[in-house]
């Protein structure tokens, strides 16, 4: 069982849902990212996605695009991000770590080489938003050979046959995009969210995590009333661009994580029929 599967099993045993946090690795520095990941874990975050910065991040909104540019300017690259993962594991970090990036950065060193190095460093899964399920055979095989979970995507526009195919191939969890477009904070979650998650759950037992647009505890509660986890990125990344002293940045991220994680625990009193954020 992968570390990701083990985490979801632990959450089920607690009657709890998951919180997955995204950080752009190297923003504002790799050393700060290391401290931020530990702060997230201490706050109860269940998994962390580390964005491997790419110069043309098509799926990312302005907040994460800016973070990627800051990380690139600070010198973040595949080698030192994987070194960061290895350092986090050497520190004793136990929660799952995933790399989110674009396929060009996987192809550049060779698919098998990238997957082998990622797994050796301590990465548990890969998220590649520009690799559709129909074109994922090579990377899926290479990832599976070294124990990496390749995360599959579904969206509100996904037809039933694509949902079924993603469900068949899914490992770790299925990333359900809450709305079309790019990442970023949104004031309101779409009314079709429940139907999309239920459509996925009708064809698989693989956990479903919802991302894009989630930034507040009430949105986490709304999402996890129907899904197995909420993914939060821009709300964390935004703090990294504020030029704060490191200790203040780490503390702000820790507090936000604690507030968001509280929304995944039982007894929140939210009805799964209501997925719109109240104004």
Curated annotation (Swiss-Prot):
UniProt keyword annotation of Transit peptide present: no
Pfam family, one: Trp_syntA
Role summary: The alpha subunit is responsible for the aldol cleavage of indoleglycerol phosphate to indole and glyceraldehyde 3-phosphate.
EC numbers for this chain: 4.2.1.20
Gene3D superfamilies referenced in this protein's UniProt entry, alphabetically: Aldolase class I
Single GO MF annotation: tryptophan synthase activity
Gene behind this protein: trpA
Name under which the protein is recorded: Tryptophan synthase alpha chain
Assembly: Tetramer of two alpha and two beta chains.
CDD domains: Tryptophan_synthase_alpha (cd04724)
Pathway annotation: Amino-acid biosynthesis; L-tryptophan biosynthesis; L-tryptophan from chorismate: step 5/5
Alphabetic keyword roster: Amino-acid biosynthesis, Aromatic amino acid biosynthesis, Lyase, Tryptophan biosynthesis
Catalysed reactions, as listed in the record: (1S,2R)-1-C-(indol-3-yl)glycerol 3-phosphate + L-serine = D-glyceraldehyde 3-phosphate + L-tryptophan + H2O
A GO cellular component entry from the record: cytosol
Active site: 49 (proton acceptor), 60 (proton acceptor)
UniProt-listed HAMAP family: Trp_synth_alpha
Superkingdom of the organism of origin: Bacteria
Family (UniProt): Belongs to the TrpA family.
